[in-house]
């Protein structure tokens, strides 16, 4: 699948693009209701027939597949690529994704939450109240951070830690000045200190987070050994440890935003909007359609279901369920 951007957009927008996108696959398979107006009044309806034509011409015919098989193949490829990206930042860095929750965001993230949970092995998905504006919301909520880095490139035994502490003080002063210039009120200011380290002869470094009190030869050796063991499952004996870079970050903590103000109020509406036919894993399913923002706190929806709102659509696969928590998030889990 290739991105068509917002202009001209997917084939189903009927704005000149004739090649299939992930959105076209979701529309053709019924996961996005074609008769539903697109958020913000951009379009009053989507043309599923154009999605079908694009998939048929560019994927199904060249590969000798049916159009339904081709559409599912598009999503299989897209999900596999996204799962691969998750593995790069988790498994390949020594983290077990099963210890994390998966949070999709953006207009299309909720359509793939169950597939990604299956692909990566995550037990819980958390769909935020307004996924389509998660990045914008983050800009007004997030703490402010300034980073600095300086090269050391010395053997651990040669490092002058008094000089390192003096450098840290200089970086702290410079980063604090940048925080002050933002004109933002902070409730607290924290610092992060890390060193890029490796064994002599290696080309890759390992970032080791430390406290000021660990900045000694013994303290840093222990911190590096523990980090290396966690990342690679073993520690090399013999090679000299080198310290390549000093990293410093200063974080201004902003007042916390109470996400519960976004939660639904009152009894809400559990009545489905109707039934949508959805093609999933080789067969058709009758999926209930819900107005997601009308669901009350505590509501539990069983898949297959489609939860719609102006900024996103959530596809809840068969075998999954979603519960509205106290902050309006959807907690997605596999059915017991």
Predicted regions: what they are:
Residues 3-13, 18-97, 104-336:
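C-terminal, non-catalytic interaction/recognition modules in large multi-subunit enzymes and RNPs
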């Amino acid at each position: 699948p290739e991105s068509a951007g917002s202009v001209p957009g997917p084939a189903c927008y009927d704005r000149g693009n004739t090649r299939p996108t992930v959105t076209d696959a979701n529309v053709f398979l019924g996961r996005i209701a074609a008769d539903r107006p697109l958020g913000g009044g951009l379009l009053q309806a989507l043309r599923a027939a154009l999605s079908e034509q694009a998939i048929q011409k560019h994927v199904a015919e060249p590969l000798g597949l049916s159009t339904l098989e081709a559409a599912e193949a598009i999503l299989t490829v897209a999900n596999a690529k996204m799962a691969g990206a998750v593995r790069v930042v988790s498994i390949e860095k020594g983290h077990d994704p099963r210890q994390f929750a998966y949070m999709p965001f953006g207009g299309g993230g909720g359509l793939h939450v169950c597939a990604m949970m299956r692909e990566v092995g995550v037990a819980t998905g958390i769909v935020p109240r307004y996924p389509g504006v998660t990045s914008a919301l983050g800009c007004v909520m997030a703490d402010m951070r300034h980073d600095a880095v300086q090269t050391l490139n010395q053997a651990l035994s040669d490092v002058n830690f008094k000089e390192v502490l003096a450098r840290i003080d200089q970086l702290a002063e410079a980063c604090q000045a940048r925080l002050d210039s933002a004109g933002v009120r902070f409730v607290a200011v924290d610092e992060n200190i890390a060193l890029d380290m490796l064994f002599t002869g290696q080309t890759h470094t390992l970032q080791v987070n430390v406290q000021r009190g660990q900045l000694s030869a013994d303290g840093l050796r222990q911190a590096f050994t523990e980090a290396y063991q966690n990342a690679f499952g073993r520690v090399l004996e013999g090679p000299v440890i080198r310290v390549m870079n000093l990293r410093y970050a200063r974080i201004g903590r902003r007042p916390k935003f109470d996400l519960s103000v976004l939660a639904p109020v009152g009894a809400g509406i559990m009545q489905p909007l109707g039934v949508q036919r959805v093609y999933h894993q080789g067969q058709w399913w009758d999926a209930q359609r819900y107005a997601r923002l009308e669901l009350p706190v505590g509501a539990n929806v069983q898949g297959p279901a489609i939860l719609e709102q102006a900024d996103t659509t959530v596809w809840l696969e068969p075998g999954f369920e979603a519960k509205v928590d106290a902050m309006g998030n959807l907690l997605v889990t596999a059915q017991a």
